Amino acid sequence: MFTALTIAGSDSSGGAGIQADIKTMTANRVYAMSAITALTAQNTTGVTDIVEVTPKFLAEQLDSIFTDINPDAIKTGMVSSSELIETIADKLTEYHAKNIVVDPVMVATSGARLISEEAIGTLKSKLLPLATVITPNIPEAEVLSEMEIKTEADMEKAAETICNTLGCAVLLKGGHQLNDANDLLFQKGKEPVWFHGKRIDNPNTHGTGCTLSSAIASNLAKGRDLETSVKYAKNYISGALADMLDLGKGSGPMKHAFALEGEYER
């Protein structure tokens, strides 16, 4: 069986973080493993508290995984401290990790910074260059490319700049600022590929970024090329959103198990 590892925070509401990643990986038929970077107290209306793990404990989690069940793909999510980012980068290098998908969570779609400038610097210098592909939103791509993004032409220029600077492929998510469903994949030496999707009118979008990146990792784990993996991941997330799950008082989660019947008759 193919295997995938998520390195991310825990979401007590189950809609994002490692919970969303594990659900996504399982739905995409790969064996999911996790290394937790932080515990969060949160629900659909917001985050109440965050407790980070120590770099030593994160390293021990990664050692335990890589020395026993070597993952076919890895996805990393939000990691808020420079020390933890460096720990992840060191361990991925030590174990010659492959098929690394980095969701560079550092700037909210509102433009607010989610991690410190020091952590952003470590992310850019240590972790992102190890990635097979990174999945920034528009504000994150603006930070990485050091340019303003207002049009699809800007998206292409920014993605090319990031790719050339960091040496990894870039899946730049259009988001609501340009077009809800249009994402751009830029790979070095290849023509840019646009993924044009139909907008799904569902206000419950908690965990979409986590879900997309872990779905890409799942498909890479199964040996698919990057473009096909993105295509399959986009199809999966569209199905999860289209099921119109409605839970909680705020922006709720999507239905990760939309294709699971859940009946186990003899």
Where are these regions (language model features)?
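Conserved phosphate/ATP/ADP-binding segment of small-molecule kinases
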Residues: E117-P192
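Short pre-catalytic strand/loop immediately N-terminal to key active-site residues, enriched for Gly-Thr
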Residues: I7-S13, P192-H206
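Glycine-rich anion/phosphate-binding loops
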Residues: S12-A16, V79-A89, L114-E117
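N-terminal basic/disordered segments at the start of proteins
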Residues: G14-V30
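Short, small-residue alpha-helix embedded
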Residues: Q19, E142-V143, N202-L226
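Charged C-terminal helix
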Residues: E52, E227-R266
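Conserved N-terminal subdomain of the carbohydrate kinase-like
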Residues: T3-T6, T26-V102, M106-T109
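Phosphate-handling active-site elements
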Residues: R29-M33, E191-V193, N219-A233
